[in-house]
């Protein structure tokens, strides 16, 4: 049995189904229960189901929009007290998964935008909104590993595009009170880029 889906398999599943959803649980036990419940609720495919810092659990799935929504709603209803974040995106931006899995090919780097959130769900939704707002490239979307449960996104593009994208991401992440911090660096030093890329 294959434990983890390869990046290629994840991208293929996304092309077939389009919608993605996530539930971020307070505990590992609840997370595993939610993953089982979500699979039994509707025809969805689990892309990620794993513990993250600090002892939380992420479930990321794909499928038809109605199936993903039904699965997320069922998990939220059954375990409302232990759900820290969730979302359903009907048409996620194509750059989301390469950014999550460190497979983004970044060509021309210009301005740098950073958004940091208190949970993973907010970071993904903010990244999706940013990428759809202006012509920017998502560089990385780091989810809750080694950062006490926080997450962040990095993106690049022209200063105006990065500024607009970061402002949109801030607005989206603030809706649930999950925005921690953000910045736009108009012209990052090349040595900084060397450490990021």
For the regions a protein language model found, what residue spans apply to each?
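Short, conserved beta-strand segments within well-ordered enzyme catalytic domains
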Residues: 58-60
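N-terminal amphipathic/basic-hydrophobic helices that include classical n-h-c signal peptides
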Residues: 1-12
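Long, contiguous binding/interaction regions
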Residues: 7, 17-55, 69-102, 106-150, ...
């Amino acid at each position: 049995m294959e434990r983890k889906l390869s990046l290629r398999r994840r991208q293929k599943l996304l092309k077939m189904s389009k919608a993605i959803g996530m539930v971020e649980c307070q505990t590992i036990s609840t997370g595993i229960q939610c993953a089982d419940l979500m699979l039994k609720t509707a025809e969805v495919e689990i892309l990620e189901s794993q513990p993250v810092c600090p002892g939380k659990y992420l479930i990321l799935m794909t499928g038809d929009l109605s199936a993903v929504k039904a699965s997320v709603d069922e998990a939220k209803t059954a375990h409302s007290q232990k759900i820290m974040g969730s979302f359903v995106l009907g048409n996620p931006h194509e750059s989301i998964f390469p950014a999550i899995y460190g497979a983004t090919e970044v060509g021309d780097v210009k301005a740098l935008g950073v958004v940091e959130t208190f949970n993973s769900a907010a970071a993904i939704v903010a990244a999706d909104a940013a990428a759809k707002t202006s012509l920017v490239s998502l560089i990385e979307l780091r989810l809750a590993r080694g950062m006490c449960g926080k997450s962040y996104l990095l993106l690049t593009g022209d200063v105006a595009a990065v500024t607009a994208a970061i402002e949109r991401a801030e607005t989206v992440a603030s809706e649930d009170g999950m925005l921690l911090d953000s910045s736009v660096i108009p012209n990052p030093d090349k040595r900084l880029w060397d450490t990021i890329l």
